[in-house]
């Protein structure tokens, strides 16, 4: 993928708003041999059941109520789309392991933030991430944001030598969608509007 396109996408996304213009984002673009090496390290760590050391808390420590139900429904729908049964643990494992190869896309984006930044900056970061995703569509590209790519920051530091003053927030896949791939027909359901919005006229 041309570097010029990647640069243009990030150039457009960097106009995302941030509190007092802090612009807390820092991006590393990983391709080619570097991506292959890092993907191998991450997948090996996952398959060997290495304990994740994610620098940023992402999921709740205890799943409850509607969040637990949505998570379960999401997994069941994804596996049923792929024809993976509850009993087929190996195929489930292989599907999850693909996360660490960035689903074999040509570009892996990794996102870092200075350790001094607080919760508000992560909100800013979300706007930046979605701006990248929307900008990519303009160039016929697809994306997939991934928390999984942030689970082994020590291995990422080993390969990419990023500063100890920074945290690895997450990653993102960037590439051309394979429309013939079954997984790309999967869409997670969204809640009805009346379950998430209240009006006070």
Language-model features and meaning:
Residues 1-201:
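Acidic, surface-exposed loops and disordered segments
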